[in-house]
Amino acid sequence: RDGYPLASNGCKFGCSGLGENNPTCNHVCEKKAGSDYGYCYAWTCYCEHVAEGTVLWGDSGTGPCRS
């Protein structure tokens, strides 16, 4: 499954430099979602093939962003 991983405050991880092979998103996706690939889409990191059990934005039980 694919999606937006969440920071500890319930917010998506921001990024700049839209597109593929974004170093920030690759790092976030590896560390927070167990994914080997991520990119910057709509100024937030999006991860593909996330690890099972990873909580993603929009999952049941996730609350609003507490920025």
From Swiss-Prot:
Keywords: Disulfide bond, Ion channel impairing toxin, Neurotoxin, Secreted, Toxin, Voltage-gated sodium channel impairing toxin. Residues 1-66 form the LCN-type CS-alpha/beta domain. Disulfide bonds join 11-65, 15-40, 25-45, 29-47. The keyword Cell inner membrane does not apply. GO terms for cellular component: extracellular region. Its main location: secreted. It comes from the Eukaryota. GO terms for molecular function: sodium channel inhibitor activity; toxin activity. Expressed by the venom gland. It is found in: Secreted. The keyword Disulfide bond applies. InterPro entries: LCN-type_CS_alpha_beta_dom (IPR044062), Scorpion_toxin-like_sf (IPR036574), Scorpion_toxinL/defensin (IPR002061). CDD domains: neurotoxins_LC_scorpion. Alpha toxins bind voltage-independently at site-3 of sodium channels (Nav) and inhibit the inactivation of the activated channels, thereby blocking neuronal transmission. This toxin binds, in vitro, to sodium channels and inhibits the inactivation of the activated channels. Seems not toxic to mice, crickets and sweet-water shrimps. Has the structural arrangement of an alpha-helix connected to antiparallel beta-sheets by disulfide bonds (CS-alpha/beta). Belongs to the long (4 C-C) scorpion toxin superfamily. Sodium channel inhibitor family. Beta subfamily. This is Alpha-toxin Cn12. It comes from Centruroides noxius (Mexican scorpion).
